[in-house]
Regions:
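Domain-level signature for proteins that mediate thiol-based redox and metal-cofactor handling
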Residues: 1-154
Length: 154
């Protein structure tokens, strides 16, 4: 198999891994897949956690290694890179769409408060800086009165 084909297959396998904390999105859509390289005959994948100390980093690395093994790369290496640091700006347009479809307001630096993912209102308030995961906060829509999580801008 040609190196470019192997690299494309490895990238597709790594990119398909869902985030364990937000399984509707892949690590690629969240912008955590930093690099996929072919070094000699070995595939090396670099992932960037969404924040320092993210508890999902180890399970994500294990899931990437498993996905690569299933794709025919049993000796692949997965490493964590911290620089450049992850930013919520790395979330793809598709990732933002999937967050909203899952009831999680995507991050938007241009807005003072996140828009309600249910009704679209910008009239929201933060209830708690802490959501189900450290990368999210709990909000409430003042229009439809529904609570929702919002992905924090980093």
């Amino acid at each position: 198999m040609v190196a470019a084909d192997r690299l494309a297959r490895a990238r597709a396998a790594a990119a398909s891994v869902p985030d364990p904390e937000i399984p509707a999105l892949t690590i690629d859509e969240l912008g955590m897949l930093h690099d996929v390289a072919l070094i000699g005959d070995t595939v090396e994948v670099a992932i960037t956690p969404s924040y320092l100390g993210c508890p999902a980093t180890v399970p994500i690395a294990q899931d990437v290694a498993t996905a690569l093994a299933r794709a025919g790369f049993p000796n692949a290496r997965v490493r964590t890179v911290l620089a450049p640091a992850w930013s919520s700006d790395r979330i793809t347009a598709e990732g933002r769409r999937k967050l909203a479809a899952s009831g999680i307001a995507p991050p938007d630096r241009a807005l003072p408060q996140p828009r309600c993912p249910r009704c679209g209102s910008g009239e929201t308030e933060q209830i708690s800086a802490f959501g189900a995961t450290p990368c999210k906060a709990l909000h409430r829509c003042l229009t439809c009165r529904e609570p929702f999580e919002a992905f924090k801008c980093h």
